Amino acid sequence: NTAALNESRISAVLGLSVPFFPRGKISTIDLFKKIYQGKFFYQLYFQEEGVAEAEFEENIRKYLELTYFSIDARGMRFQKENAINASSKGPNARYLDGIPEFDTYPSWMTNEDMDYLVSEFENSGMRGPLNRYRAQQIDFEDLLELTDAKIKQPSAFLTGKYDPVNFLSLIHI
């Protein structure tokens, strides 16, 4: 959105993992409610304030380990090979339900790294990061000028083979 709103100040765009989508006719939250009706979807789970916070803050280390390690290449490969998909969970599931656990840390994460993250989130809590998801409806209402917006600057989108965004296809729903 920054590039579409500030064309003269942004010379190029590189998107990582999350592709750009212009503002549509309905909000992404309303779209997700239609697409995932009767199914679990993490962004809908995050909407009710306090629910995800309570689950994650119960054991921040477990939340971080399960989240990070289930969506890295090893975790996504495991989920693909075992036909595990978050949309197969019911609408009343919790976020951590059914997420695969691993006995070892991947090479890109050390115990010291995890200790630091746990310490930071124990101090700040999870509300701030989750509020970004909750602001989607506000963005939809406030950014009418982004309807059908296009990124006019030179741009590229980069994703990895096992990036979770590649598995959010409607085919899986």
Predicted features by range, described:
Residues T2-L170:
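Flexible "cap/lid" subdomain of the alpha/beta-hydrolase fold that forms the substrate-access gate
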